Swiss-Prot record:
Protein biosynthesis recorded as keyword: yes
CDD domains, per database record: UBA_EF-Ts (cd14275)
Organism for this UniProt entry: Corynebacterium glutamicum (strain R)
InterPro entries: EF-Ts_dimer_sf, Transl_elong_EFTs/EF1B, Transl_elong_EFTs/EF1B_dimer, Transl_elong_Ts_CS, UBA-like_sf
Name of protein: Elongation factor Ts
PROSITE patterns: EF_TS_1, EF_TS_2
Entry keywords, A to Z: Cytoplasm, Elongation factor, Protein biosynthesis
Involved in Mg(2+) ion dislocation from EF-Tu: annotated span: 76-79
Annotated family: Belongs to the EF-Ts family.
GO cellular component, one term: cytoplasm
Gene3D superfamilies: 1.10.286.20, DNA helicase RuvA subunit, C-terminal domain (1.10.8.10), Elongation factor Ts, dimerisation domain (3.30.479.20)
Main location: cytoplasm
Intracellular or extracellular location(s): Cytoplasm
Lineage: Bacteria, Bacillati, Actinomycetota, Actinomycetes, Mycobacteriales
Gene name in the database record: tsf
Known function: Associates with the EF-Tu.GDP complex and induces the exchange of GDP to GTP. It remains bound to the aminoacyl-tRNA.EF-Tu.GTP complex up to the GTP hydrolysis stage on the ribosome.
Amino acid sequence: MANYTAADVKKLRELTGSGMLDCKKALEESAGDFDKAVEILRVKGAKDVGKRAERNATEGLVAVSGNTMIEVNSETDFVAKNSEFKEFAANVADAAAAAKANSQEELAAVDVDGKTADAALQEFSAKIGEKLELRRAVTLEGDKTAVYLHQRSADLPPAVGVLVAFTGEGEAAEAAARQAAMQIAALKASYLTREDVPAEIIEKERSIAEQITREEGKPEQAIPKIVEGRLNGFYKENVLLEQSSVADSKKTVKALLDEAGVTVTSFARFEVGQA
């Protein structure tokens, strides 16, 4: 006959966050000693950390606080949509914003209720039994930011997040900046202007364009012009200000921003599980 009750199991689950089966086993092992059962579960959680470290965390969410955006990963979408996980991520995002965290290392070191975010993460990981990761953080400079968070389905937290730092006044400016954030989420611009594209990337694209053009048998004298045209195509696909706007395909993003008196100074895009 068990020397513990269903109420003991419930209380132990609420206190430790462990599963029902683990709580029952701990109470059996402790012969109903509640405090010892708590200790058993804490030891089990610590041992499980090593096992969890070998698993992949490719689900999760993107959270934003002020000018700061973070990505926190979990193993399953079941945990990603858990209210405790979302609350944990929100608290870390607030701490990251206060510290202006701008890298994974800085994110892991921010203070969350008197402990580092990494330490808080490990405790929470032991509680829920899944590998969790503080993936990355970015903080944009500027007084104004537009935010767009995209959910892949209504029951899941945001999996894509975009922050846009901008200057401009009024509702029209704010709407245009948010539209730019939505554009970045959808079309995945990598650069703000063509001047931001690294020289080695340009040379690589130029080389590929020239190789393709030659293989097509184009006249030698026409090759430079065709290559430049293809390079411009690369810019229009990858440079935000040169993309055709999803809101008005007849205009570039730059044209619509100019109409609203907006200057985008920087942006960042996170997608859960992606580089």
